[in-house]
């Protein structure tokens, strides 16, 4: 499907929906170089790589399931004589028992069984040493649980609900250098640190302390001097110093020392002695600071030796250990400071020279040397023991344990992995050329990290920015599932190792070794309950798409809301074109959950990249290149709206561009790239807001979030003012039906479309070329909204591959349609639009403009209880006849019944324990023998506040339980429907087959056949018409090739019938077999109610610009303000909502909407006057000519198509004003002029109640308004009595618990302030938790006695108990 979508957009032909209603594009840029990519690619592609389902086992790449298996297998026994190897895997083919729809109905997971081919190799124990002889090899397919499959639209069905796994934005593995911003130490000194983050394994941190010593932490444990880890790696003091320092070489004379001079190293030092050239001329006086000029002079004079006094050496550090050559004893250790004493010793032992560390305050500090002095360890073993003590405190260290622990921490592939990404980032950061290498750390890696850290402390190099998108990567579904799978496999590995070491391993098969439970449990847990596996937002097509394109920084291995600071949440320069700066939730998650930008995608390493057009020598080419945030920094990148001449040359002298994350101006010859599109920086939802460029960012954020909450209306209406993204979203979301192949519509009804495919599209002769599309009718979505598809094509219409055949929820002729176009006036109206309230006309209710259908699902479960089974029946104790009127004999409500709150949907009785019966009851039971008293009524009733129509009932019965009448009736109806569908399908396919046969046979010479067909006769149509179609296959032809084709058709005919029978059998089996229900469940009944909700006061509405409000009242049409021609407005908004919010886009949209409506009206008038196609074409041309670029080709349409187009434009000519490239003020004025409307955008309005003209003209026009899924029906709630909390005996809270209203602390103060003592007492006792008092009160009200006497509130008893629990005896004194 993905391919179908992406390809269809590239076709040059005009699509079917566009012919029906084309948008006038007011964008300024030439045709898009890059079409919008398939919007669900991230999810689908990632999961495809994980499964590699249709790729042969040998050809599978090293990722996904394959990689997980390869990383854990082969598993070798402890002895090494048995090995379990992985060969390959296969996923159960298309024969998965239930398809997506059935899984949703039955509450199952849509998955395929995973079968893994494993090989057990057993080696001969008796073989001579050093030679391994294979004794036995067994290969077997092992079942390893089920792997969920992805639906075509990128979601997963888990336990019957559609879920989406959101991609995670996490810190890329690699090495990062940062400082604490001076917050750790009171002096404000910057403390630098480095952190090596692996993909999995222990973290390694290096850090400076305020005294400039280096420390290391492993997994954030207690810190150790950093040189401990270097010693553990096997380096000694001298080697460590050698790695980090250069040395100065001194020769010892009797009284002085001579330095082998490297002039550069003197820079910045004080000259201790005069420095003279060979002629004795003083170059540097004593006690002068040596500057760069002095150094040049010294170099010029070629001075390479310098005699210095002894005290120059004092305090310097020895670089190499000095040994007495005669005795072999150590005189001075490396890293020892030189003192007068030491110099004396050196001279005494006739040491000729020594090396000191070259230290310079500016560029080379003493950090490592100082750290070595702190380090108490002296050799490798001591260092290893020290690390062992930190990692395993309290355990006695042994040499072996310490060595294996350190080895396992960073150098073992099982425990530690940087991954390819981590290695690439690591090598790049420490300045290596090659980007590949081992996944584990090496000695050199650790040394390099320390070296870079020391360099940064010395002022060479910068710290990293962790919010840069080059340091954060995307982890999508496939990768996360793979990690979970690996976790499961590692658990299996331990068990397999133990079993392989058993004595009788020779008699075992791979199946006996591997237990699939841990693997399937890990996968189940991930898809079922991971923080990133979310219940899909299915409000409308946009919310689905956005949910699948979401990127979250939360979740396992990510951030937590509490810890995330401002920096992480902020918009970063690298977000440009990768992550949307606008769309993010308001509230605690702001900035942590983002949306992918329209063109963004993840590269092989998981870094986000965005496309740019290449610019070569000032000329913009059509070549596009994807750049990641890392690569982008080095280039000059121009904006998408930069001025370009016809040949693509950059025109301006100075061009605004981005370079290294800054906006700057530069000359055209420096430009390397240019943006592909102005909407490149925003997400799909933000790209749907016209005039986004005129809105304040905060309101745009609300606008993009609120579009996702729009409820699909009964009759969707596409926006008059759109952005051109509407079609893309409707097609890619998967809610519409898309033609898989081109053809002609053969038949259409409400639930099925049949397309006769063009001959050239059919793959082979066997393919008769019929595509059948079944539509989804009135199904419940995750958000209880209604999913319903209806065809937009008619019989005989030609359709191209990728065209929209049927609209889904919130789509109108293949375009996204979230709301309705309303005539809006910005004016106050009697205070009814105070503070963002909205005033609407009764016309919207009458015309059902915002009526929505919501489908509720009610479930009734009959279980086995200790006292006996629950029963679903219409025989319910103590329930009147009227309450049972809507139930059938089985106790289940009829389809089509109108039900209200409290009505019984499914009658159910539960056995209750035997109770002592009163004599009267005993007598009754003796007479009537009824069991009325030993069961209680636990029927499923309609919850309060819901009224609706029953539209469906599903019954699932446990295997082996007798089915009731209703179940059999439903099964029979379902089966006959399936049978009818299959027969229809067969008929259509057979008709096509015989049509092809007729073409084949007509005019051919026969060699004999039924009805006395003589040899040599030509076959005619009339002969075929008289012959029953079955007998056509008995005709014999003289042409061999034709005979072969006839035989092939006969085979195909038989095949069609067999397929039908097989499908029917399969369906019958699926319908009649008992469901796989949870333990203890006998029967489940699901009842679906359709609730029609009209718009009413209290509902929330919004425009697309963050202009939201609640309906305050609905005014009769005749009272609404009206225009001069008598048109009453639909909705009145408060003008004060615009200036302070700075979302001016809504005003521009209103003006442009009015103009488009006016143009539509003019076209409508022409049609009414009976204009023909020629006249219509003439009047449409100037409108479509407004498009500067991407002009719609009217000439390509035939006359009937022009008429259809014009008819569809009567409601208004839809216009697209792309984001950041939209219509200008001049164009809006021009359009208003064309529509004969005032160019001010304001008109005189008249008061509907008095008929008087308002004092000044008002801004009127058409705005697109949405009804949001915050409906007053779902929020209204009232309670008289209900359930109480167990401990406090106070009423519960919230609508879901049918709770009361909280009377809190402040409300108590209010009553106290008014002195309303009795009211207060009532609130705190009988209306709350005085148990006896409230029962008495209830009785009093029934008796008509309205007195109240308050008793002891239960909360007082709770308080007494609380105090007693503190061992303070407290009790009430009874007087």
Curated annotation (Swiss-Prot):
InterPro entries the record matches: DNA-dir_RNA_pol_bsu_ext_1_sf (IPR042107), DNA-dir_RNA_pol_bsu_external_1 (IPR019462), DNA-dir_RNA_pol_su2 (IPR015712), DNA-dir_RNAP_su2_dom (IPR007120), DNA-dir_RNAP_su2_hyb_sf (IPR037033), RNA_pol_bsu_bac (IPR010243), RNA_pol_bsu_CS (IPR007121), RNA_pol_bsu_protrusion (IPR007644)
Catalyzed chemical reaction(s): RNA(n) + a ribonucleoside 5'-triphosphate = RNA(n+1) + diphosphate
EC number in record: 2.7.7.6
Database matches in CDD domains: RNA_pol_B_RPB2 (cd00653)
SUPFAM superfamilies the UniProt entry points to: beta and beta-prime subunits of DNA dependent RNA-polymerase
Source domain of life: Bacteria
Residues spanning the membrane: none
UniProt key word ATP-binding: no
GO molecular function, one term: DNA-directed RNA polymerase activity
Record-level GO BP terms: DNA-templated transcription
Entry's Gene Ontology cellular component terms: DNA-directed RNA polymerase complex
Alphabetized UniProt keyword annotations: DNA-directed RNA polymerase, Nucleotidyltransferase, Transcription, Transferase
Biological role stated in the UniProt entry: DNA-dependent RNA polymerase catalyzes the transcription of DNA into RNA using the four ribonucleoside triphosphates as substrates.
Subunit structure: The RNAP catalytic core consists of 2 alpha, 1 beta, 1 beta' and 1 omega subunit. When a sigma factor is associated with the core the holoenzyme is formed, which can initiate transcription.
Protein family according to the UniProt entry: Belongs to the RNA polymerase beta chain family.
PANTHER family reported in the protein's UniProt record: DNA-DIRECTED RNA POLYMERASE I SUBUNIT 2 (PTHR20856)
Protein name (Swiss-Prot/TrEMBL): DNA-directed RNA polymerase subunit beta
Organism placement in taxonomy: Bacteria, Pseudomonadati, Pseudomonadota, Gammaproteobacteria, Legionellales
